[in-house]
């Protein structure tokens, strides 16, 4: 098989979903550049013209008329070179991926074939791979992957798998921006590049940024982009996701409830890098349960970041609401009903007051949207308040475990531009909701979740395939290999649980939480950025009460019968 030699331009586009004119004009500009550089071929990513998630447009004729109008403009621009782009096709009231290839204004592709022959350039064919197509061994001189791959912190990019299977020259053309799925969003990672036959794949375009590059295949490729450290890449994915989603919605201002805790601190750091200081508003909303330590952390961060900052105590609002609550009697005929006030009710009232009342009102005056600061460790078990701290326009950090948030914030503290904005006390103060005396950080009290242990356990519940269930975890506990399986320090389980009874109670409690009301909370929470293959929103789930199996009950009784 001969080496394919041609001058090619690959374009890594920021594709705006549904904005056909904007996408097409960008493509036409790149085609014009390719002609000026005497390129033989210009290639665009999957769904380059329309964007991907356009379900609302499925039955709107004007959308498809607009697409056809600009498609013809692209065809007219294919004189003197070949243009290949990914597009959408409607079949049986569903979208499916397709591509178009035009040379000198003539169609050289067919809807039912993934192969293209370019007259005058190749003595064989080009194999086109669309999203979800498996790479196959063929006699093609060149394979092109038209992609829309998202960044995932737990999996490798598609070009790595492709590169191991494809023996021809190989081009990977990805896009940047976001895919908005409603309950979650994905950040498209870019990293478009090329592999000459028998060489390694070379990323020629960066993560998350739009761009294009021209080169002659079979010759020495341009210098690859420098590799990015894992933590830096994670931070960039968060920043670009926030930036692109705000742009997607036509928004420019954000409010953050800055409690002085680790989660709101990370959100603040991210948005401070996305927005100008005048478009970021931070609000500290203390009650009598908030310590001077966390209030001081919030004030220090706001001062260093130099954005809008205000303190709005909620104690009087809570007191007024509780007085009205206590003085209200509900009647039916001659009966009276007085509703009890539990500690949990008062805790949730504080969270809802902060978000649904104060931040929502301030957002209207500021003309901005509320950032949700929830993390995956809390979301999985419903440790948050519905219509309270789970509300917002986007949960940027929603697919990060608590330990990952600590690790990322520690990394950011080494950055010169953020070093002074991240107080040391964030790492020494116990993570706490500060909603009651039981959350007093000055006494070392805090959340009921032991993150160094539970993060690993919860991750096995939802991210491992197959999932770890209580039966599996209990078997590992009985065999003494739970720590090894969850990659925990030896002795961690015995440190947290003094008896099998304590271990089993904890295991069952969190498993019930995961499968119960927390599912309803997740469905009604802010959309979350997906950074993994098993993020919430991607996982289809419903509320199914946990009924222990016979095997679980038998093993549990065996363990408990041996005594403490």
Question: Whereabouts are the PLM-identified features?
Answer:
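ATP/NTP-dependent adenylation/nucleotidyl-transfer catalytic domains that generate, transfer
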Residues: 168, 222-259, 264-564
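Active-site-adjacent "lid"/gating segments
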Residues: 2-4, 179-253, 270, 279
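Glycine/threonine-rich flexible loop motifs
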Residues: 53-59, 149-158, 181-183, 346, ...
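Catalytic-core segment of enzymes that process non-peptidic bonds
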Residues: 62-132, 160-213, 346
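Short secondary-structure boundary/capping segments
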Residues: 56-61, 98, 158-161, 187-191, ...
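Active-site beta-strand/loop signature of hydrolases that rely on acidic residues for catalysis
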Residues: 23, 34-57, 84, 140-149, ...
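N-terminal glycine-/serine-/threonine-rich phosphate-binding loop
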Residues: 2-41, 240
């Amino acid at each position: 098989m001969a080496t394919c030699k041609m001058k090619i331009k690959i374009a890594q586009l920021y594709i705006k979903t549904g904005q056909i004119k904007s996408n097409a004009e960008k493509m036409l500009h790149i085609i014009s550049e390719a002609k000026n550089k005497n390129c033989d071929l210009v290639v665009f990513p999957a769904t380059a013209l329309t964007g991907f998630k356009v379900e609302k447009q499925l039955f709107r004729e004007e959308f498809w008329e607009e697409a056809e109008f600009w498609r013809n403009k692209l065809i007219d621009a294919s004189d003197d070179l070949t243009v290949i782009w990914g597009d959408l096709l409607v079949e049986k009231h569903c979208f499916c991926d397709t591509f178009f290839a035009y040379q000198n204004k003539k169609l050289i592709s067919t809807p039912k074939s993934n192969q293209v022959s370019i007259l005058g350039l190749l003595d064989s064919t080009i194999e086109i791979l669309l999203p979800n197509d498996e790479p196959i061994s063929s006699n093609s001189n060149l394979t092109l992957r038209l992609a829309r791959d998202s960044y995932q912190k737990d999996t490798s990019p598609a070009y790595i798998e492709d590169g191991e299977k494809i023996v021809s020259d190989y081009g990977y053309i990805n896009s940047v921006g976001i895919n908005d799925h409603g309950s979650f969003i994905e950040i498209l990672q870019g990293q478009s590049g090329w592999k000459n036959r028998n060489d390694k794949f070379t990323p020629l375009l960066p993560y998350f940024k739009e761009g294009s590059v021209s080169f002659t295949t079979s010759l020495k490729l341009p210098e690859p982009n420098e590799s990015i450290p894992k933590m830096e890449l994670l931070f960039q994915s968060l920043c670009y996701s926030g930036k692109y989603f705000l742009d997607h919605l036509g928004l420019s201002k954000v409010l953050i409830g800055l409690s002085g805790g680790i989660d709101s601190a990370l959100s603040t750091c991210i948005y401070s890098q996305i927005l100008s200081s005048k478009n970021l508003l931070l609000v500290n909303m203390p009650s009598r349960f908030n310590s001077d330590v966390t209030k001081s952390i919030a004030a220090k961060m706001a001062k260093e970041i130099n954005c809008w900052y205000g303190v709005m105590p909620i104690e009087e609002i809570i007191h007024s609401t509780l007085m009205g609550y206590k003085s209200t009697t509900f009647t039916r005929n001659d009966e009276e009903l007085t509703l009890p006030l539990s500690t949990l009710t008062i805790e949730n009232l504080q969270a809802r007051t902060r978000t649904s009342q104060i931040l929502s009102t301030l957002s209207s005056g500021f003309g901005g949207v509320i950032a949700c600061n929830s993390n995956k460790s809390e979301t999985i078990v419903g440790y948050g308040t519905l219509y309270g701290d789970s509300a917002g326009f986007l949960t940027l950090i929603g697919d990060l475990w608590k330990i990952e948030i600590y690790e990322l914030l520690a990394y950011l503290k080494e950055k010169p531009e953020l070093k002074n904005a991240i107080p040391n006390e964030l790492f020494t103060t116990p993570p706490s909701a500060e909603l009651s005396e039981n959350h007093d950080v000055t006494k070392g009290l805090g959340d009921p979740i032991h993150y160094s242990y539970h993060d690993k356990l919860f991750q096995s519940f939802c991210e491992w395939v197959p999932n770890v269930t209580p039966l599996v975890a209990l078997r590992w506990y009985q065999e003494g290999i739970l720590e090894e399986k969850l990659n925990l320090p030896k002795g961690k389980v015995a440190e947290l649980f003094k008896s099998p009874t304590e271990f089993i109670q904890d295991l069952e409690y969190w498993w019930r939480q995961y499968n119960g009301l927390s599912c309803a909370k997740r469905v009604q929470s802010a959309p979350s950025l997906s950074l993994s293959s098993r993020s919430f929103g991607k996982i289809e789930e419903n509320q199914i009460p946990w009924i222990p199996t016979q095997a679980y009950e038998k093993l549990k009784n065996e363990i408990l019968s041996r005594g403490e």
